[in-house]
Amino acid sequence: MYSLKQIKPDDVGLIRISQTETPSSFRLICFPESAHSTAYYLSLSELLLPTVEVLAIQYPLYIGVEDEERLTDSADLADRIFGALGEWMDRPLAFFGHRAGADLAYRVAERLERETGAALLTLFVSGRTAHWGMTLGPPVLGCRIVALAGEGDPKTPLRGVRAWRRRTSGRFDLEVFPGARYYLDSSRREVVNLVHDQLLSQVPIDAEWEAGVEDQGA
């Protein structure tokens, strides 16, 4: 199922990429690198187990592939996305951010923990080094961070990717795939297997998640 809740070009919304016939165990929310790359996650979702419902953030349509700064430095955009998540927070969440979308996913994850007390199961940061400002100070997140990188990608040296470790007090994993900058295409099935393994290794504690969501609405 592929549905869009966007009316105006400057709207922020969520696209439901896949919907399970029975209630899903997890929701994976994808943060693309631009407003024009959301459809990519349809092919990714087709490989995922039905226990994982996939949604993607639809950015304002004026954000293109050359507008990284609007994704990485926009507190307003992060706030708007956080507000749009409200109706989707009845299941344990994981975020998957690719390239500039990884920075934005981190910002929204930070806001989620701060405002609701409900941490993500996993924050997947793909094809992105940790911004230098993110490595200063104590860890902000408590959720697991899994960093993905392409072997030999000159734009994501592994030293910079490993710096994501400093952003969480929880577990950190680094996974490197062949394919350099385009590993997400050439290693798609391996990436999907990684997502499965990471999510299924964590038993969702619905009571704790729902308690955090209820506190937000109180």
Protein language model annotation of sequence segments:
Residues 1-218:
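Domain-scale detector for complete catalytic domains at protein termini or as standalone homologs
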